[in-house]
A protein has these predicted regions:
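Glycine-rich active-site/cofactor-binding loop and its immediate structural neighborhood
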Residues: 21-24, 32-33, 37
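Active-site-adjacent structural elements in enzyme catalytic domains
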Residues: 16-17, 26, 53-56
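Low-complexity, Gly/Pro
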Residues: 24-25, 198
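Primarily the internal scaffold of c-type cytochrome electron-transfer domains
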Residues: 1, 34-62, 66-191, 195-246
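Short loop/turn segments at strand-loop or loop-helix junctions that form parts
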Residues: 25-26, 65
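N-terminal alpha-helical interaction blocks
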Residues: 1-15, 23
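Conserved ATP-binding subdomain of kinase catalytic cores across diverse folds
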Residues: 29
Length: 246
């Protein structure tokens, strides 16, 4: 979809957005980072438009080693975070990887301002924790020191009418999960959204990435909540979701 939206200019030579926007859209990121290093991020998005085909979208290589099919991470900002907390991305247990492959993209992030590292390199703002308050505290002192009236504080964009610097919270799914009851219980993202199934006698993860509610029997939920009916679980989930949305 990123090739078809008008937020990124698809009608001219310049896209008007940094190449960072490719980070969660194609595993070709591995190739580009090897080729350009940190110079890649601040390049124009449209410079790479012709290098991507339909086969280069999110796929097997986003989460798997192409030779062994073991889970692996390609996301530079996620690997940066893991290294900062003393974890080797290549030596993590499978139970943790079944959520971290999702955390490559389903997260809050920001693009580095000059003076805080490679320009436009994506960063996951987790150094103080995963709560909204912890994430906001990172934005208090990682911004453009030259921005009038907002010196030192980070802003994703400036409102064109009021000229007010703004934050744009993306999609903090991993952060919501890890601080929620399922994350605390050690339930992985894939346990609910890619539950195990059997095909021709083999156990494998479903690759229909969707809500467990799409299954009338709620089999993903009942792997753990075996004493509850599908109707009860559906009602409980919808009650919680409705309360949250309101």
């Amino acid at each position: 979809d990123i090739l078809e939206i008008d937020r990124i200019n698809r009608y001219g030579e310049k896209g008007g957005m940094p190449a960072t926007c490719w980070n969660c859209k194609t595993p070709k990121m591995v190739q580009w980072i090897k080729q350009y290093g940190d110079d890649f991020w601040a390049k124009d998005f449209n410079q790479f438009r012709t290098e991507v085909t339909d086969d280069d979208s999110i796929g097997c290589a986003t989460c798997h080693n192409a030779e062994t099919m073991q889970l692996q991470l390609y996301s530079e900002p996620l690997k940066d975070y893991l290294k900062s907390v003393g974890k080797d991305p290549a030596k993590l247990p499978r139970s943790e990887m079944r959520s971290l492959v999702c955390a490559q993209c389903h997260v809050e992030y920001y693009f580095n301002d000059p003076g805080h590292g490679p320009t436009k390199r994506p960063v996951f703002p987790w150094k103080n924790g995963f709560t909204p308050e912890a994430i906001y505290s990172v934005y208090e002192d990682n911004g453009n020191v030259d921005m009038p009236g907002f010196k030192g504080k980070f802003a994703d964009w400036v409102h064109p009418v009021s000229q007010t610097p703004m934050l744009k919270m993306q999609h903090p799914d991993y952060e919501t999960w890890i601080d929620g009851p399922h994350g605390a219980a050690g339930v992985a993202c894939a346990d609910c959204h890619m539950p195990y199934q059997r095909e021709e006698g083999k156990k494998m993860s479903s690759h229909w990435w969707t809500s467990p509610l799409r299954d009338p029997e709620l089999r993903a939920c009942r792997q753990c909540h075996a004493d509850k009916t599908a109707a009860y679980l559906r009602g409980r989930i919808e009650y919680t979701q409705d309360k949250t949305y309101k």
